[in-house]
UniProtKB/Swiss-Prot annotation:
Pfam families: HGTP_anticodon (PF03129), tRNA-synt_2b (PF00587), tRNA_edit (PF04073). SUPFAM superfamilies: Class II aaRS ABD-related, Class II aaRS and biotin synthetases, YbaK/ProRS associated domain. The lineage of its organism: Bacteria, Bacillati, Bacillota, Clostridia, Eubacteriales. Consists of three domains: the N-terminal catalytic domain, the editing domain and the C-terminal anticodon-binding domain. It comes from the Bacteria. It is found in: Cytoplasm. This is Proline--tRNA ligase. Catalyzes the attachment of proline to tRNA(Pro) in a two-step reaction: proline is first activated by ATP to form Pro-AMP and then transferred to the acceptor end of tRNA(Pro). As ProRS can inadvertently accommodate and process non-cognate amino acids such as alanine and cysteine, to avoid such errors it has two additional distinct editing activities against alanine. One activity is designated as 'pretransfer' editing and involves the tRNA(Pro)-independent hydrolysis of activated Ala-AMP. It comes from Clostridium tetani (strain Massachusetts / E88).
Length: 570
């Protein structure tokens, strides 16, 4: 394509709304434009990248034996009520009514739809295994859309669903998808790690995320520096610290006037926070729940919600609720005699001796409290792992990093097939529920993640495989007939080789052309300037600082080499 005939919408200034590199660069490079909060139009360059990623996804899914189809984005509420998720998804679901007052939603995910198709189309084990996938726009009413494509209200996603006769076959399907995802992200030029994950509202027995390490990632990941274990911090098990056994001392109430926070209590009593147990109070749907954890630990709300069997609304309790539960002012909650629907005790607390707790009385705490002797509750892992915790596999040290989730795979099991009656007849003629898997890739988020990993101060540095165009040919002076003739010859030759190539034939200053090429991130730049009189041109890779002076014929060989390095065919 010739740039003089294209919509080139580059910006020199960073839009005020953009916070992270990918968001800034996609707007500046003219990849997309904002329509509303969390809603974007893909411009020509951006759409080409999306299509490249989609093509890679399709190839790998097809190679893994999956079949593509397209489901409706407008979904009737009956399916969601049948699965029990109409209320579980909460306010993130876009809900609407038609003119006959029938309820619908814009699909945030498609488990129910695929299950409905399966129960209507699959009736025998002879039709299994089956894997269906689609690439489609999803909709979620995010409370606070931010970071461009990282957290938007509509996003392009590939979702696949496998149907098997038993869990052994599900393991096979799951492994195929794992390998396909591994291939997809390598081909997209991403450095990606697979980590254990929470299944969230999707449900199911097993789950893993494909995470791109990035400082701007919204997820925290726990990694082992010894064995390579990785898990989303929502899922990572916290290994309890072991304490030296102590003789149990007598429980005693102590006066702590005007002490309402952990920091104030530490200073007042001059103690280590590891000798404190704090009691956090939450409102979970229509219940009040208290969680007792060590004073210097942070509660893991996902673990708490999972322990309670899920929740639509989960929030810290308000002052009135706390006063009713403790008969005291805020700041003195403790596990002894607290009036709540459920008391959860972090496992680490059960290993502690003679610790400090709130007394549920204004101005007082207890010292020398001990689990079992003084209080009991539902014991479990309710805290977040931290840097330096022990790995659950090898005992090595855990490190915490931030990451961007680009893919997620689930072993759903029979959660949806049982609730929606998706059954098949097995070899014995007996009816059994289909065993399902779910596999999602954020296509638009993958685009953003690729930029986060591949950019510099001048713009995007696209991997060759997903770049909007492979090569840009830049004549320095378009009015120079010799330069333009050579540039067009190179342009046409590269096109004939199957290279996706741009010719910057705009009547712009050379500096503007170079800045646009770098900003948009075209992997290879061929510059035709004064040296064309000697049959020479400049050849430069976007990812490298240095350039080479080559004969024109050498350019074609260099381009072929670059394709081979990226495992791309011409």
């Amino acid at each position: 394509m010739k740039l003089s005939n294209m919509l080139v919408s580059t910006l020199r200034e960073v839009p005020a709304e953009a916070e992270i590199p990918s968001h800034k660069l996609m707007l500046r490079a003219g990849m997309m434009r904002k329509m509303a909060s969390g809603v974007y139009n893909f411009m020509p360059f951006g759409l080409r990248v999306i299509k490249k990623i989609e093509d890679i996804v399709r190839e790998e899914m097809d190679n893994a034996g999956a079949q593509e189809f397209l489901a409706s984005a407008l979904l009737p509420s009956e399916l969601w009520k049948e699965s029990g998720r109409w209320d579980v998804f909460g306010p993130e679901m876009f809900r609407l009514q038609d003119r006959n007052n029938r309820e619908f939603c814009l699909g945030p995910t498609h488990e129910e739809v695929f299950t409905d198709i399966a129960r209507n189309e699959i009736n025998s084990y002879k039709q299994l295994p089956l894997n269906l996938y689609q690439i489609q726009t999803k909709y979620r009413d995010e409370r606070r859309p931010r970071f461009g494509l990282m957290r938007s209200r509509e996003f392009i996603m590939k979702d696949a669903y496998s149907f098997d006769k038993d869990y052994e076959d599900l393991d096979v399907s799951y492994k195929k998808m794992y390998e396909a995802y591994h291939n997809i992200f390598i081909r997209c030029g991403l450095e990606c790690n697979c980590v254990e994950a929470d299944s969230g509202a999707m449900g199911g027995a097993g789950s893993a995320e494909f995470m791109v390490k990035s400082e701007v990632g919204e997820d925290e990941i726990a990694f082992c520096d010894s064995c390579g274990y990785g898990a989303n911090i929502e899922k990572a098990p916290a290994i309890s610290e072991k304490f030296d056994q102590e003789e149990l001392k007598e429980l005693a109430k102590i006066e702590t006037p005007n002490v309402k926070t952990i920091d104030q209590l530490i200073k007042f009593l001059e103690i280590n926070p590891a000798k404190l147990v704090k009691t956090l109070i939450y409102k979970v749907d229509d219940k009040v729940v208290a969680v007792a954890i060590r004073g210097d630990r942070e509660a893991n709300e996902i673990k708490i919600i999972n322990a309670l069997g899920g929740a639509v609304n989960f929030e810290m309790a308000d002052e009135e609720t706390i006063k009713k539960a403790t008969n005291s002012e805020v700041g003195f909650a403790g596990p002894i005699g607290i009036k709540v629907d459920c008391l959860l005790i972090d496992e680490e607390v059960t290993n502690m001796y003679n610790f400090i707790i709130g007394a549920n009385e204004t101005g007082y705490h207890y010292k020398n409290a001990n689990y079992k002797r003084d209080f009991e509750g539902i014991v479990g892992d309710y805290r977040k792992v931290i840097q330096g915790d022990k790995c659950p596999l090898c005992g090595g040290n855990i490190e915490i990093a931030r990451g961007i989730e680009v893919g997620h795979i689930f072993k759903l099991g029979t959660k949806y097939s049982e609730s929606m009656g998706a059954n098949f007849l097995d070899e014995k003629g007996e009816s059994r529920p289909l065993v399902m898997g779910c596999y999602g890739i954020g296509v638009s988020r993958t685009m953003a993640a690729a930029i986060e990993q591949n950019h510099d101060e001048n713009g995007i540095v696209w991997p060759l495989s997903i770049a909007p165009y492979h090569v840009i040919v830049v004549p320095v002076i378009t009015k120079d007939e010799e330069q333009m003739k050579a540039a067009e010859e190179i342009y046409n030759k590269l096109k004939s080789m199957g290279v996706e190539v741009l010719l910057d034939d705009r009547a712009e200053r050379p500096g503007v052309k170079f800045k646009d090429a770098d900003l948009i991130g075209i992997p290879i730049r061929v510059t035709v300037g004064k040296k064309i009189k000697e049959g020479k041109v400049e050849y430069k890779l976007r990812k490298e600082e240095d350039l080479e002076i080559l004969n024109i014929e050498q350019v074609y060989d260099k381009v072929r080499e670059e394709f081979e390095k990226s495992s791309l065919k011409l």
